[in-house]
């Protein structure tokens, strides 16, 4: 079974770079305090690293 991580959006995406908004959508985040579980892959880690200032990660 793949390892999963919990990602929570902590800040708004309004006024952010379009690439960062797309990263949030790719992670499945829609609003502040929305939490999703995603697989721990290099692809998702890259998206999380790009928007690190808007999300909180729990291993």
Curated annotation (Swiss-Prot):
The cellular component terms of Gene Ontology attached to this UniProt record, alphabetical and capped at eight, are:
cytosolic large ribosomal subunit
Keywords in alphabetical order, please: Ribonucleoprotein, Ribosomal protein
Origin: domain of life: Bacteria
Q: Which CDD domains match?
A: Ribosomal_L30
Could you give a GO molecular-function term held by this entry? Answer: structural constituent of ribosome
Does the keyword Ribosomal protein feature in the UniProt annotation? yes
Sorted alphabetically, which InterPro entries does this protein's record hold?
Ribo_uL30_ferredoxin-like_sf, Ribosomal_uL30_bac-type, Ribosomal_uL30_ferredoxin-like
For this chain's UniProt record, which GO biological process terms are given? translation
Membership in a protein family: Belongs to the universal ribosomal protein uL30 family.
Q: What HAMAP family does this protein map onto?
A: Ribosomal_uL30_B (MF_01371_B)
The name this protein goes by in its record: Large ribosomal subunit protein uL30
The encoding gene:
rpmD
